Amino acid sequence: MTSRRSHGDVTPFLTQADNTEEEGVRDPESQSSDEEEEEGKDHGKETHLLTGISYKRSVIIVIILFYINLLNYMDRFTVAGVLPDIKKAFNISDSNSGLVQTVFICSYMFLAPVFGYLGDRYNRKLIMCVGISFWSLVTLLSSFVSNQYFWLFLITRGLVGVGEASYSTIAPTIIADLFLADQRTRMLSFFYFATPVGCGLGYIVGSEMTSAAGDWHWALRVTPGLGLLAVLLLIFVAEEPPRGALERKTDRPLTNTSWSSDMKALLKNPSFILSTFGFTTVAFVTGALALWGPTYLMRSRMVIYKSKPCEGGICNYDDSMIFGGITCITGILGVLTGVEISKRYRKTNPRADPLVCAVGMISSAPFLFLSLAFADTSLVATYVFIFIGETLLSLNWALVADILLYVVIPTRRSTAEALQIVVSHLLGDAGSPYLIGVISDQIQKGKPASFLIQMRSLEYALMICAFVGVIGGGFFLTTALFIEKDRKKAELFSQGLLPADETDAERIVVPKRGRSTKVPVSSVLI
């Protein structure tokens, strides 16, 4: 059994920090990783001393959270998978088609801070149960909206954001309270596999259900029943760990600060802010591609093969199926590759996470551009370039989440998740699908209607994504300048060596000549 330090003794931490810099011993992250893995072996079937949850149960909880995340993305991208049928049923333009996704993202975005505040202070399992139940009910109701009431369909899709906001702000913080260091990164990478897999399954399930039932409404009736199962798993299987117990080496509850103090601290955290803006560009690109990718490929096929997409009342979803499969594979491959590269690179460079994210974003831009440029001549080449571009985009999913968790203290993590969601969606995928649709409509205006014009207009609009990707790479490169200092500062907070109140955040109390003395944080961090 791994021994624990006394709660009141902080000297070993300072000694460990000094040794890390001056004597060349292994850094705290490596030691905590080794310690945690040893505990996992010793206590796989026993209750952890600090969390009160066994390692086996912790893994099961992560699997449940993965399942719910999978459902969330399945539901979100089922709509994208059957968008041509929805557009035809409601007789709407490209801009209004983009509005379907934008309304959902806006609701999700504005409710995230509410659930972030609640998630830092109240029972997280209960909050998720209520949110997922509401999401499942509203999703089911949206499938019964008549074709004459597009505005009502928009409202129901907007309300779906309530459930997703309740879940996405909380789930990563639960994983952070169950695991540390490399184990946390591995669990986060598994959790974020649900993003690409859910997206891909959304396209596939949506198109297959529509083809089988002959009605796109049935595509929206798959996830509600699965959502009910998720609620039951949360109630009867999942447990809630104490916040920050593993990092503080004590199960004593943390003291919450005011919401205004939390926000001030987060806004003064450059690594958090810059990585959030970097992730915003990821959201912009993926949001635009997720909604418009299958539609653009369908239009390209119409131009190349002179085919008609929607004969007999049902649209051809071969491209949705292929795009969904590519999204699944590239997402898994990208997340695994990003985590593995970062894990190896960390051994020589503590700035590995933001640097890997930056390389992924910048490298994806030319491949996304080429995928659009070749779409009217070779769909095979287009799919190859999409595969490479989406793989590079997916390098950062788990890494951005990990950055947030290790530069933000435990009592502010749900709030930080919420703030990141607001910014990334407000400036990212809340507007990008609608913006792409508006630009496409404007390019088509005044021109004779044809499949070629429809394809070209969407092609030129989607080219914005390549340039946004390069901007995102710049944000992640800048994050690398601050990541070490912000990480060490968060570690001091979690160990109780730095006050949570930001009024004293720049100074730390240490023994000096027999009495306590405040010294600058930088003197400890160096």
Swiss-Prot record:
Renumbered residue ranges of the record's region Disordered: 1-44
Keyword line: Lipid transport, Lysosome, Membrane, Transmembrane, Transmembrane helix, Transport
Subcellular location: Lysosome membrane
GO molecular function terms attached to this record: transmembrane transporter activity
Signal peptide: none
CDD domains: MFS_spinster_like
Regions crossing the membrane: 59-79, 98-118, 126-146, 159-179, 187-207, 218-238, 272-292, 321-341, 355-375, 384-404, 419-439, 463-483
Gene3D superfamilies attached to this UniProt entry: MFS general substrate transporter like domains (1.20.1250.20)
Membrane association type: Multi-pass membrane protein
PANTHER family hit by this protein: PROTEIN SPINSTER HOMOLOG 1 (PTHR23505:SF13), SPINSTER (PTHR23505)
Role summary: Mediates the rate-limiting, proton-dependent, lysosomal efflux of lysophospholipids. Selective for zwitterionic headgroups such as lysophosphatidylcholine (LPC) and lysophosphatidylethanolamine (LPE). Essential player in lysosomal homeostasis.
Family listed: Belongs to the major facilitator superfamily. Spinster (TC 2.A.1.49) family.
Record's protein name: Protein spinster homolog 1
Name of the gene: spns1
